[in-house]
Amino acid sequence: QDLIYKGDASAWLKTAYGLKARYTMRLINRSTDKQADLNKVLDYVSKSFTSADDEAAYAVYDANNINPFFGYFDSRAGFANSQSLTDKLIERKDPRLERVMLSPTTADKKRVQVTGSADKNLVPAPNGTPEQNMQKYGVSAFVYSNTAPTMLMSYHELKFLQAEALCRLNRTSDAEKALKEAVAAGIAN
């Protein structure tokens, strides 16, 4: 039973090329011909996903069958957005601050999406040894959805791999374009 692609062999072939890109890049420092292997990464990426619609997402969760990552993070008190991460996102005007940061609100223990660096709900955990209370500090939206799919391979990961390969090949303008596409795809996801 194929719970990801429902038996679509061409979709699995695209996923296989994406995984080849991932693991070729993962082993790049052991390569005897880095330039050739970086070009292989680019070739594999070109044969893989063309949009987020293609990505390998295990999307079978519901109220009775929660995402295991959510279960893991929700059952532990020590996960929160750190002060240092939050400061870096603010300093760099990183759009992920508004997209992925959730902060606690009132006693109802619901979360709200942060609207920016001036948002009074932006409550990062202090660096060091903060109180272990996930309800007190902000968390990533990606760990706060019990029905979010588990990604085997995402489109934005491929775009990041493409950007890294291009950068290592000193094709900086192409790398910058791929990086911007990767960030946009990741935020949209």
What is each residue range found by the language model?
Residues Q1-L161, A165-A188:
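Structured, solvent-exposed acidic/aromatic patches
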